[in-house]
């Protein structure tokens, strides 16, 4: 997490907790000529547009007061989507038994993507079941992105 994301987390946590939402992720990224501060929130039953607006307005006010971002940027508050990232230990507990996708920094046996059922997070290793008889333990430092797999 970079400095802006960390400051944003400190500013938004009281807003999210007051509404009993879950803070899923924060990203500060440059895309083309623009910079985006993206905040992903969730709650049981899903986030509504009104929920996003409420959090966006509260965070925008706090960001204006603290002024941690010097350059121009767009603030976006949304749900994490169907392919939400799994980053915190609580995410791995919450989605145990779900299909996930690991994107690796470097290919292993010619593969940079592994998909399987999340067994858990054990000793900082992501454990997934890739077949009825095979489980894989992948150290988190080898994984660039862990996210829920979209099922069609």
UniProtKB/Swiss-Prot annotation:
Disulfide bonds: none
Record-level GO cellular component terms: cytosol
Source species, domain of life: Bacteria
One Pfam family, short name: DUF150_C
Cell location: Cytoplasm
Keywords: Cytoplasm, Ribosome biogenesis
Gene Ontology terms: biological process: ribosomal small subunit assembly; translation
Principal subcellular localisation of the protein: cytoplasm
Described function: Required for maturation of 30S ribosomal subunits.
NCBIfam families: PRK00092.1-2 (NF000928)
Family according to the record: Belongs to the RimP family.
HAMAP family: RimP (MF_01077)
Name of the protein in question: Ribosome maturation factor RimP
Source species: Alkaliphilus metalliredigens (strain QYMF)
Record gene name: rimP
């Amino acid at each position: 997490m970079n400095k802006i994301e960390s400051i944003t987390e400190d500013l938004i946590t009281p807003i999210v907790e007051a509404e009993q939402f879950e803070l899923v992720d924060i990203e500060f990224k440059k895309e083309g000529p623009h910079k985006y501060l993206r905040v992903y929130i969730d709650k049981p039953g899903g986030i509504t547009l009104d929920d996003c607006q409420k959090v966006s307005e509260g965070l925008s006010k706090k960001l204006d007061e603290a002024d941690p971002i010097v350059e121009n940027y767009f603030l976006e508050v949304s749900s994490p989507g169907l392919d939400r990232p799994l980053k915190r230990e609580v995410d791995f507990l919450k989605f145990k038994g779900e299909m996930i996708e690991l994107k690796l920094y470097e290919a292993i046996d010619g593969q940079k993507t592994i998909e399987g059922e999340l067994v858990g997070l054990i000793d900082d290793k992501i454990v997934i079941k890739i077949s009825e008889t095979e489980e894989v333990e992948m150290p988190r430092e080898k994984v660039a992105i862990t996210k829920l797999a979209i099922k069609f």
